[in-house]
Amino acid sequence: MFNSQAAVASKIIVALDVPNLEVAIATIHRLPQVQFWKVGLELFCASGPMILDVLKDQGKRIFLDLKLHDIPNTVAAAARAIAPYGVDFVTIHTATGLTGLKTAQAALGESATQLIGVTLLTSIGADTLQQELQIPLDPATYVECMANLAHQAGLAGIVCSPQEAARVKQRWGENFLRICPGIRPLGSATGDQARSLTPNAAFAAGASYLVIGRPILQAADPAAAFDDLCSSLV
């Protein structure tokens, strides 16, 4: 699937889902081979931009997963504030709507940061979507609708489950990124993920990047777990 472990590692985003800056720094040092880290709400709320400085000082790529979701003026202001951080990706909920997506994209200005639309959380399955949220669509159709908004707004790509990646790639092409969480290696517990696939299946389905957290960070030997994952995809 890939011609080297380094090529695989560049496409694996490890979720730095830890409670504070001290634990984050220890985790980063324990996994020097990881090139790309996801910083989510928990860690960003605990550490603020300091964690971004730590990662940039070590030459790491950063996926800032804040899932912006507010009125257009507010998401634009947030995007404008994020731009100087110099992260690679930042996320926004596509349910913000087309106007909000466009204004947030415009607010990034000349920044190299790419805006990524979150379509449907991978913890949400058909029952939750249709019965609790009262959206009368199956997850794949809903994701395609949200991906269409992101594409219209000029976003770089979307976050979707690996189960929808092929459909998105077929419609919008290779350059419209598909970043896929909900990845569970064989033998791993699915936990709270309702729409998941194995790493091999996810890349085969058309994922551009995989986001993997617990199967690596909660392993007895996280570094070995990451290396084994990369080896399995070469």
Swiss-Prot record:
The keyword Cell membrane does not apply. The keyword DNA damage does not apply. It catalyses: orotidine 5'-phosphate + H(+) = UMP + CO2. Pathway: Pyrimidine metabolism; UMP biosynthesis via de novo pathway; UMP from orotate: step 2/2. GO terms for cellular component: cytosol. One of its GO terms (biological process) is 'de novo' pyrimidine nucleobase biosynthetic process. InterPro entries: Aldolase_TIM, OMPdecase, OMPdecase_AS, OMPdecase_bac, OMPdeCOase_dom, RibuloseP-bd_barrel. GO terms for molecular function: orotidine-5'-phosphate decarboxylase activity. PROSITE patterns: OMPDECASE (PS00156). Its EC number is 4.1.1.23. This is Orotidine 5'-phosphate decarboxylase. It comes from Thermosynechococcus vestitus (strain NIES-2133 / IAM M-273 / BP-1). The lineage of its organism: Bacteria, Bacillati, Cyanobacteriota, Cyanophyceae, Acaryochloridales. The gene is pyrF.
